[in-house]
Amino acid sequence: MGVSKVAIAVAVMLMVVVINHPAVVEGLTCGQVTGKLGGCLGYLKGGGYPSPACCGGVKGLNSLAKTPADRKQACACLKTLAGSVKGINYGAASALPGKCGIRIPYPISPSTDCSRVN
């Protein structure tokens, strides 16, 4: 009986340790996406040519989105962000990667199916 009490105590202590240590979350967050593209808002609303800061953010985001899961997450975040900002010029948004000298494997559009992004 003493052994089972010790085993239970050890199991409880292990559960407490596991519960109190948050899991490491890997992957891209919407906060990172928003942070990288914050310098692009003027371009996305007014067109013209994106600033060097904007293109730096676009390139940085492209570098962060290393896996298909990251790219799907970035796509979903961009769609959410675009829906929350009034006055976005979607033609300018679609042209943004090319104007910054990068290629992405999916169109930037409110109708993009993020589940198909690889």
Swiss-Prot record:
SMART domains per record: AAI (SM00499)
InterPro entries: Bifun_inhib/LTP/seed_sf (IPR036312), Bifunc_inhib/LTP/seed_store (IPR016140), Plant_nsLTP (IPR000528)
Disulfide partners: C30-C75, C40-C54, C55-C100, C77-C114
Thermal activity characteristics from the UniProt entry: Stable up to 84 degrees Celsius.
TM spans (from-to): none
UniProt PTM comment: Disulfide bonds.
Name of a matching Pfam family: Tryp_alpha_amyl
Region forming the signal peptide: 1-27
Function: Plant non-specific lipid-transfer proteins transfer phospholipids as well as galactolipids across membranes. May play a role in wax or cutin deposition in the cell walls of expanding epidermal cells and certain secretory tissues.
Name of the protein this chain belongs to: Non-specific lipid-transfer protein
Native source organism of the sequence: Apium graveolens (Celery)
Lineage, broadest ranks: Eukaryota, Viridiplantae, Streptophyta, Embryophyta, Tracheophyta
